[in-house]
């Protein structure tokens, strides 16, 4: 939601998931964070800068002012001399990854079914939760602080 009073706005309600994804991919704690908003009344167009305890950096461009023809969700990972580019959770291209160049899915898969199954298994079978509580609290705290900057 864009309404800051109902739902906390898009940083708390939506961009938080991208912060969470970067925490998962890096596997380390966020050391520093900053946000730069575009000058709009809705505060729904922003760039978020994250740095992690291992020196990794992450940048989230959460924009509401682009063309609908551009992929809505795009993730680029630069590591070990290679690049992975994920578009809309359907198309993955690899550059500089020996033996891998691309993968395409028929439909978008953001992992919700797998996450629900992991959550149910954690409760019913005593497995570890799919997302550690410390990560949930860290991402929530940082998302709230970023939304208030």
Regions found by a protein language model. Name each.
Residues 7-9, 103-106, 125-129:
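Active-site rim elements
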Residues 1-36:
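Predominantly a Rossmann-like dinucleotide-binding segment in NAD(P)-dependent oxidoreductases
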Residues 15, 19, 42-46, 133, ...:
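Conserved glycosyltransferase catalytic-site signature
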Residues 18-19, 112-117, 143:
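A general structural signal for well-ordered alpha-helical segments in protein cores
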Residues 53, 118-149:
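C-terminal helix-rich "cap/oligomerization" subdomain common to oxidoreductases
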Residues 13, 72, 131-134:
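Residue-level signal for the nucleotide or nucleotide-sugar donor/cofactor binding architecture
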Residues 37-43, 53-117:
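NAD(P)-dinucleotide binding in Rossmann-like oxidoreductases
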Residues 48-50:
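Short beta-strand scaffold segments in enzyme catalytic cores
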């Amino acid at each position: 939601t864009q309404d800051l009073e109902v739902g906390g706005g898009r940083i708390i309600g939506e961009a938080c998931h991208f912060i969470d994804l970067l925490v998962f991919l890096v596997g380390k704690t966020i050391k520093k964070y900053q946000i730069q908003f575009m000058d709009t009344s809705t505060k729904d167009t922003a760039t978020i800068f994250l740095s992690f305890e291992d020196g990794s950096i992450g940048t989230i461009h959460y924009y509401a002012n682009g063309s609908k023809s551009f992929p809505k969700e795009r993730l680029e990972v630069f590591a070990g001399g290679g690049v992975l580019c994920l578009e809309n959770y359907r198309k993955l291209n690899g550059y500089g990854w020996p033996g891998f160049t691309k993968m395409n899915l028929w439909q978008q898969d953001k992992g919700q079914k797998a996450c629900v199954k992991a959550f149910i298994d954690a409760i019913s079978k005593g497995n570890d939760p799919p997302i550690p509580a410390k990560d949930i609290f860290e991402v929530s705290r940082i998302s709230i602080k970023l939304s208030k900057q």
